[in-house]
């Protein structure tokens, strides 16, 4: 799910996911999204 969404909309979804997951456990996910 993450790979698909990130690959499709890296700009829109990446930002949204980063913000949402930053509160739960996006520190790692956020960094991965930023790098990708």
UniProtKB/Swiss-Prot annotation:
User: Can you say where in the cell this protein is located?
Assistant: Secreted
Where is it predominantly found? Answer: secreted
Is Secreted set as a keyword in this record? yes
Q: Name one GO cellular component term.
A: extracellular region
Q: Name one Pfam family in it.
A: Gloverin
What are the record keywords, sorted? Antibiotic, Antimicrobial, Secreted
Task: Please give the InterPro entries that the UniProt record associates with this protein.
Answer: Gloverin-like_protein
Superkingdom assignment: Eukaryota
Q: Does the entry annotate any disulfide bonds, and if so which pairs? A: none
Q: Name its GO BP terms in alphabetical order.
A: defense response to bacterium
Q: What job does this protein perform? A: Antibacterial protein.
What name goes with this protein? Gloverin
Q: Which species? A: Heliothis virescens (Tobacco budworm moth)
What lineage does UniProt assign to this protein's organism?
Answer: Eukaryota, Metazoa, Ecdysozoa, Arthropoda, Hexapoda
